[in-house]
UniProtKB/Swiss-Prot annotation:
This is Cytochrome b. It comes from Astronotus ocellatus (Oscar). Its main location: mitochondrion. The chain crosses the membrane at residues 33-53, 77-98, 113-133, 178-198, 226-246, 288-308, 320-340, 347-367. GO terms for molecular function: metal ion binding; ubiquinol-cytochrome-c reductase activity. Its cofactor is heme b. Heme b b566 binds at H97, H196. GO terms for biological process: mitochondrial electron transport, ubiquinol to cytochrome c.
Length: 380
């Protein structure tokens, strides 16, 4: 008689995804980040659920309720710290996961890749509305600045902003709906993750060579299930260490001050994981242009499969394209630094050069280099 896990309608799905899944024998640690993102999502939903039990989404009590969680709720300080820093680890994993996809040509699985980009947008939206909830100074002014960007939409801009706000400024209605969105989105993300995996399992994973690995597959369990568990342990140790030893390292001190519409903080800036996009937004002196650049800085990922000109999939055997990849990584690091700096010389011009280079690498240099490398492979 066949094993129950292979015949039971529900267990069969889990078995095909987690036990008997054929995986390439040579996938490296860079393939761990998908499962780590799943762990991050589960941890965020769990800690978020416990926070939501004690949080109140009203401007009169939101800030106090967060203070109450940290002071009076059993291990509330830990739950909040894990949730806030968990978001940072979520983005570390997501950026490494995308970097892996770009380096090894995973984007050629177009459905999986495009759903991944939609997932990135959903996670970014969730993080944004979540940052508003503690109702500190940076929460309030961050919400004001970013929602105001919608006013750049021609003709309907102002109506759109007031519709999002639920009034004529960021107020109680805004906070309440942002809490509703922040509660809802993670479950939408979980559903989209399932679709992401369904499309991935249609084709199977890529591998570091970029070659077809059908001839050399191993089962997911026990090999990669244990490899994933090691990743889980490392991530959780790192997260707990940060949450216990320096929980406010990545936060903004301005958010310890309750929101005040009459006092603008000297430097309005988002959390570190949005700084690269914020730098691109600020580097264009026109409002609509900046908003479009901000949007396109993420959506450009959807163009990557179209701009793939090389005969090889991965960058493993393509030194020139490898150089461009690391140039892009360095460029994003520079943008992240610039996003946290005040708008003054020389940061303005550095930001503008880095923003130009960001799009130039994706749209011009990568496809051209792919064609060049194809030419170099021709035997004469």
């Amino acid at each position: 008689m066949a094993n129950l896990r292979k015949t039971h309608p529900l267990l069969k799905i889990a078995n095909d995804a987690l036990v008997d899944l054929p995986a390439p024998s040579n996938i490296s640690v860079w393939w761990n980040f998908g499962s780590l993102l799943g762990l991050c999502l589960a941890a965020q939903i769990l800690t978020g659920l416990f926070l939501a039990m004690h949080y109140t989404s009203d401007i009169a009590t939101a800030f106090s309720s967060v203070a109450h969680i940290c002071r009076d709720v059993n291990y509330g300080w830990l739950i909040r710290s894990m949730h806030a820093n968990g978001a940072s680890f979520f983005f570390i994993c997501i950026y490494l996961h995308i970097g892996r996809g770009l380096y090894y040509g995973s984007y050629l699985y177009k459905e999986t890749w495009n759903i991944g980009v939609i997932l990135l947008l959903l996670v970014m939206m969730t993080a944004f509305v979540g940052y508003v909830l503690p109702w500190g100074q940076m929460s309030f002014w961050g919400a004001t600045v970013i929602t105001n960007l919608l006013s750049a939409v021609p003709y309907i801009g102002n109506s759109l902003v007031q519709w999002i706000w639920g009034g004529f400024s960021v107020d109680n209605a805004t906070l309440t709906r942002f809490f509703a969105f922040h509660f809802l989105f993670p479950f939408v993300i979980a559903a989209m993750t399932m679709i992401h995996l369904i499309f991935l399992h249609e084709t199977g994973s890529t591998n570091p060579t970029g070659l077809n690995s059908d001839a050399d597959k191993i089962s997911f369990h026990p090999y990669f299930s244990y490899k994933d568990l090691l990743g889980f342990a490392i991530l959780l140790i790192a997260l707990i260490t940060l949450a216990l030893f320096s929980p406010n390292l990545l936060g903004d001190p301005d958010n310890f001050t309750p929101a005040n519409p009459l006092v603008t903080p000297p430097h309005i800036k988002p959390e570190w994981y949005f700084l690269f996009a914020y730098a691109i937004l600020r580097s264009i002196p026109n409002k609509l242009g900046g908003v479009l650049a901000l949007l396109f800085s993420i959506l450009i990922l959807m163009l990557v499969p179209v701009l793939h000109t090389s005969k090889q999939r991965a960058l493993t055997f393509r030194p020139f394209s490898q150089f461009l990849f690391w140039l892009l990584v360095a460029n994003v690091a520079i943008l992240t630094w610039i996003g946290g700096m005040p708008v003054e010389h020389p940061f303005i011009i550095i930001g503008q050069i880095a923003s130009f280079l960001y799009f130039f690498i994706f749209l011009i240099l990568v496809p051209t280099t792919g064609l060049l490398e194809n030419k170099m492979l021709e035997w004469q």
